[in-house]
Amino acid sequence: MGSVLQENGQLDGDKWTPFLDPQTWTTYLLPGLWGTLKAAVASILLALIMGTLLGLGRISEIRLLRWFCGIIIETFRAIPVLILMIFAYQLFARYQLVPSRQLAFAAVVFGLTMYNGSVIAEILRSGIASLPKGQREAAIALGMSTRQTTWSILLPQAVAAMLPALIAQMVIALKDSALGYQIGYIEVVRSGIQSASVNRNYLAALAVVAVIMILINFALTALAERIQRQLRAGRARRNIVAKVPEEPDQGLDTKDNVNVDWHDPDYKEVKHPGPSF
């Protein structure tokens, strides 16, 4: 393969020099990178909100709400992201639901939000279901309502337990933003190909785009790992504080008013005489 690339001139130095020109970055790569980050951040935030609401609705005590959320989750998890983007693009364009300049962006965010939100909902539902049932029962026994139990007891633990899966889903959302290329959205892959069509360096352009995506994924993973460490440290501090008694132990309270020096091996019991009548 290397010899074939060498024969086609794809490994020549002049194929890589355009990336040393600031104009290549300001014209193609940086606008595409901004488009990728903008779509990914918007869709991840909306997917987290949607996934939380659907996940809680999936475990609701209201049967109709459980069925409704379950239908939404299973439907949008089964549809490919690209089909969701194309459907949203045609829907928004036909009924003029969004401005024409934001049409591709809205379609990309819609597709990523609906798919990843459904997956996140199932992740949260599984995380809550994996917690011991005794925690819910204890909270209810203490007088907490179902909503208080879910938001204050179950949901924080489920998020902490399922954080690696949530991080993986965020990375998937970031990479799937490249599918917006099919509906004309300007993101980093499309910008890289546009740059390659001008400079005739497709291999170099795709390699640079791949490095950019890898760096973004590493940064997202590092941020999530830092958040996870802070969550674990916070739980550890709370456990330590919970185990420290509020008052020091004062020893045994004897009923017969016996003072005992437990430090002296030859201690003697000294009894205080009771009140004389």
Curated annotation (Swiss-Prot):
<dbReference type="InterPro" id="IPR000515">
    <property type="entry name" value="MetI-like"/>
</dbReference>
<comment type="similarity">
    <text>Belongs to the binding-protein-dependent transport system permease family. HisMQ subfamily.</text>
</comment>
<dbReference type="GO" id="GO:0006865">
    <property type="term" value="P:amino acid transport"/>
</dbReference>
<dbReference type="Pfam" id="PF00528">
    <property type="entry name" value="BPD_transp_1"/>
</dbReference>
<keyword id="KW-1133">Transmembrane helix</keyword>
<feature type="transmembrane region" description="Helical">
    <location>
        <begin position="37"/>
        <end position="57"/>
    </location>
</feature>
<dbReference type="InterPro" id="IPR043429">
    <property type="entry name" value="ArtM/GltK/GlnP/TcyL/YhdX-like"/>
</dbReference>
<dbReference type="GO" id="GO:0043190">
    <property type="term" value="C:ATP-binding cassette (ABC) transporter complex"/>
</dbReference>
<feature type="transmembrane region" description="Helical">
    <location>
        <begin position="203"/>
        <end position="223"/>
    </location>
</feature>
<feature type="transmembrane region" description="Helical">
    <location>
        <begin position="67"/>
        <end position="87"/>
    </location>
</feature>
<keyword id="KW-0813">Transport</keyword>
<dbReference type="InterPro" id="IPR035906">
    <property type="entry name" value="MetI-like_sf"/>
</dbReference>
<feature type="domain" description="ABC transmembrane type-1">
    <location>
        <begin position="33"/>
        <end position="224"/>
    </location>
</feature>
<comment type="subunit">
    <text>The complex is composed of two ATP-binding proteins (GluA), two transmembrane proteins (GluC and GluD) and a solute-binding protein (GluB).</text>
</comment>
<comment type="function">
    <text>Part of the ABC transporter complex GluABCD involved in glutamate uptake. Probably responsible for the translocation of the substrate across the membrane.</text>
</comment>
<protein>
    <recommendedName>
        <fullName>Glutamate transport system permease protein GluD</fullName>
    </recommendedName>
</protein>
<keyword id="KW-0029">Amino-acid transport</keyword>
<keyword id="KW-0472">Membrane</keyword>
<feature type="transmembrane region" description="Helical">
    <location>
        <begin position="153"/>
        <end position="173"/>
    </location>
</feature>
<dbReference type="InterPro" id="IPR010065">
    <property type="entry name" value="AA_ABC_transptr_permease_3TM"/>
</dbReference>
<keyword id="KW-1003">Cell membrane</keyword>
<keyword id="KW-0812">Transmembrane</keyword>
<feature type="transmembrane region" description="Helical">
    <location>
        <begin position="103"/>
        <end position="123"/>
    </location>
</feature>
<dbReference type="GO" id="GO:0022857">
    <property type="term" value="F:transmembrane transporter activity"/>
</dbReference>
